[in-house]
Amino acid sequence: MKKDALIIVRGGGDLATGTIHRLCSAGLRVLVLETTQPAAIRRQVALCEAVYEGEATVEGLRAVRIEALEQAQSVWAQGAVPVLVDPEGACIARAKPEVVVDAILAKRNLGTSRDMAPLTIALGPGFVAGQDVDAVVETKRGHRLGRIIREGSAIPNTGIPGVIGLSLIHISEPTRP
C-alpha cells in the first residue's frame, strides 16, 4: 500500500485507537470519523476524546478535531491524526479512501458497505466478511483474538462483558484484626 493512501477509520474508541496507532506507526495517513458524543470505556486511551477536548494524545500519537474534510491535510502536515464528526460517513465518497475500517464496535453494522472503498474491514461481530465488508477482525478475547476472517463472521456478541483484572473475590472466612 502506498504511504499516501488514505485510510478512514470509523470510530475512535480504545480499540479503534490501537488500530489507528498501528496504522500511523506504519506511516499511513489516517482520518478518524466519530459521532457527536462518542463513548469509550477507557477514555484516557481513546482518540475520540479529541471530539470533546479539541485534541487528544495516546502513546505519543496526537489527534486533532477538525470541522471540515479540507482541514485534514494541515493536521497530517503536523504529524497528527484528524478527527471529523461524521457519524454517517458522508465524507467517505468525497475523500475516496483506499481503505475503510469500521471500528465502531456497535456489535452490528451501522452502515459500512463494501462499496465505500477498494478494501473494507470491520472489527468485531455484526459483519459478514465477503458480504458487508472484505474482512472482519476477531475482537473477542481468547486464542482467536486478532484473527482475520475473509469469509463469515466474528464470534457473536454474548452480551456478557469480558473480565479485565479481577471480577469477584470471595472470602470464605471473615478477616480478623
Predicted ranges, named:
Residues 169-177:
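Residue-level detector of conserved catalytic or cofactor/ligand-binding positions
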